Amino acid sequence: MTNVSYDPTRELYKEYNEAFQKHYKEQTGKDIRIVQSHGGSGSQARSVIEGSRADVVTLALSYDVERLQRAGLIDAGWEQELPDDSAPYTSTIVFLVRKGNPKGIRDWNDLTKDGVSVITPDPKSSGGACWNFLAGWSWCLDHFGGNEI
């Protein structure tokens, strides 16, 4: 069995696959070999569309899953599988600061302070970067009601 997924899930699936292998053996009496393939979400989607073997595919962005649907690899309506058209994952955004946190960064609003720079991956090439931007946008909607500041 080949599990194709995006980069940050490597450790999660290593543990999950080991638990699944044990469960499968208990249920069927047979061993199952699971091969992991990890890369950027868009690259993984493209690879599967172009014919790479995949029994299980998990991607970071709904856009990449939609590409699989358009290629005829999954049925329409996949987004309704979970309540509120949600994803089966959560992401935690972490602010890394200099030792001692000299600029007092504690929340999204602190990122607007003079002299604060933000470094994040390019959302065109990183699913995690898209989630970073969406988390910031969500924070703004919650705190400013969609009004510009």
Question: How does the language model describe each region?
Answer:
Residues 144-149:
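Ligand-binding pocket segment of bilobal, Venus flytrap-like solute-binding proteins
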Residues 128-129, 133:
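Active-site cradle of extracellular carbohydrate-active enzymes
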Residues 1-126:
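N-terminal segment of the mature folded domain
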